Amino acid sequence: MDFIAGEILYFNKPLTWTSFDLVNKFRYKLSRKLKVKKIKVGHAGTLDPLATGVMIVCTGRATKRIDEFQYQTKEYIATLKLGETTPSFDLEKEIDAVYPTEHITRELVEEVLKTFVGTIQQIPPVFSACKVEGKRAYELARKGEEVELKSKTLVIDELELLECDLPVIKIRVVCSKGTYIRALARDIGKALGSGAHLIGLERTRIGEVTLDMCMSPEEIDDFLEQNVVKIEEEK
């Protein structure tokens, strides 16, 4: 494999790792193996630290294709806890409000999910990488500053209820670029006349790339050992 000319690799990001952690670890190991000081490495779509799953990583000149992958549809398996909200809409922050769930039934959940299929408007979470006047929203939010984000037009292609063990539900989401599953959880909770936050998230597909095609960070060393071409210096 020619990592400088450009390769496209698939990883399964572990829980608690940032997307940068994964890219940084691979870049470090790759540059050491190639014995070069610098090599371009980038990813095609951020995953939150509390999410796991598919990440596409590009090297060398293949980093020019990152936008192409970012615009492909993505599939997620999300687990939502109904009746409770957090400022981050996931487990990163503590529960800040509790809502009733006694009125929620499986039938109501299925009816509400149908209303989110198609073109929707979504306001991103304030704890996100969206920019506000040149600054990341999460940087402002962590300082306690008020952050106002504009809604974005998104497309939800599929939304399926996989499990319903109230107040916990598990859903499968197929969506367009820019969709925040945390924000979707918030909006589903509101539509149910309650609240909700994410307690689990796995990205299972980007375009045609599925989880079973991905390697774990623990496999990087063996992968590089097998795929870095040892080129002898010409004398």
Curated annotation (Swiss-Prot):
Q: Name one GO molecular function term.
A: tRNA pseudouridine(55) synthase activity
> Which top EC class applies here?
isomerase
Q: Which domain of life is it from?
A: Bacteria
Q: What is its EC number?
A: 5.4.99.25
Q: Which UniProt keywords apply?
A: Isomerase, tRNA processing
- One Pfam family assigned to this protein is TruB_N
Tell me the active site: D48 (nucleophile)
The chemistry this enzyme catalyses reads: uridine(55) in tRNA = pseudouridine(55) in tRNA
One Gene Ontology term of the biological-process aspect is: tRNA pseudouridine synthesis
Looking up InterPro entries in the UniProt record yields: PsdUridine_synth_cat_dom_sf, PsdUridine_synth_N, tRNA_psdUridine_synth_TruB, TruB_C
Q: Which PANTHER family match?
A: PSEUDOURIDYLATE SYNTHASE TRUB1, TRNA-PSEUDOURIDINE SYNTHASE
Q: Which family does it belong to?
A: Belongs to the pseudouridine synthase TruB family. Type 1 subfamily.
Instruction: Tell me, in a sentence or two, what this protein's role is.
Output: Responsible for synthesis of pseudouridine from uracil-55 in the psi GC loop of transfer RNAs.
Name recorded for this polypeptide? tRNA pseudouridine synthase B
Origin species, per record, is Parabacteroides distasonis (strain ATCC 8503 / DSM 20701 / CIP 104284 / JCM 5825 / NCTC 11152)
